[in-house]
Amino acid sequence: MSKMLLIFFLATLVAANAHGSYFPLITNQIHLLRPQSGSGGSYVEGLSCLSWRFGVETNNVIGWKTVPVTCEDYIGHYMLGSQYRKDSKVIAKEAFFHVKSLNLSKNGKDIWVFDVDETTLSNLPYYAEHGFGVEPYNSTEFNAWVLTGNAPALPESLKLYKKLLSLGVKVVFLTGRTEDQRTVTETNLKSVGYHTWEKLILKGKEFSGKTAVAYKSAQRKKLEEEDGYRIIGNIGDQWSDLLGTNTGLRTFKLPDPMYYIG
């Protein structure tokens, strides 16, 4: 099932370059493949996958290592179907409305913090080949995928990025990727439309063994208290992108039911 979904994903991703977006194009195809758990989250062996995903997105289901096996097809349908794109669109729009409501400074110190993986860049081609999060995380295989530099942009995040730049807001990318992945990350971001940024912050060795919350809090604190920036917004797919200190005026959580980072 994962390979079939990946074929649809890659084929429609190519079409997106000419037609604008890939998600709406595959909606009917995905629903033709609907297995025992459809995108409405019907019960599977006593488990509602829709309810499980809701618990994940609200940070009530925490500390999990893998997606429940019985939810693989449901998560695949969600991620490659139209609902994921619709959910992301609502969040990106609210983020833009938030910025429009602010009195932006003229000193060039207003910044917006973006996470990278599953926020600006999508690793769906990788996860479609690995059970949409059902398989345990394999750092060797995932890092090999990252080094290809082939991650596509998340369309709604790219739109938000461009709108923020048009308003004079500077962008900072704050990612859990490590410093040795800087070059490929820069190249990948630029190749899909993220052409400029104020800073790209990657995880240095001094944060080895630290939680994502501790690492990102420290970096945001430095941005505000040492560099003099004002974080007007912060968007990510993990709650660990948004919790801790110096989180910004508002935070925005994008959907991601494929993996958990605490």
Question: Where are the regions that the model predicts?
Answer:
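Loop/turn elements at helix/coil->beta-strand transitions in domains of secreted/extracellular proteins
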Residues: 107-110, 165-172, 195-199, 227-232, ...
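Active-site-proximal beta-strand/loop segments in catalytic clefts of secreted hydrolases
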Residues: 115-117, 124, 174-177, 202-205, ...
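Substrate-recognition "cap/lid" segment bordering the active-site pocket of phosphatases
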Residues: 179-232
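Second-shell loop/turn segments in exported
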Residues: 78-85, 143-150, 172-177, 209-210
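Acidic, Mg2+-coordinating phosphoryl-transfer loop and its flanking beta/alpha structural elements
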Residues: 217-262
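Substrate-recognition element of Asp-dependent hydrolases with the DxDx(T/V) motif
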Residues: 118-119, 148, 157-190, 199-204
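Active-site neighborhood of HAD-like aspartate-dependent phosphohydrolases
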Residues: 85, 105-111, 120-152, 166
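Non-catalytic pre-domain segments flanking phosphatase-related domains
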Residues: 2-114
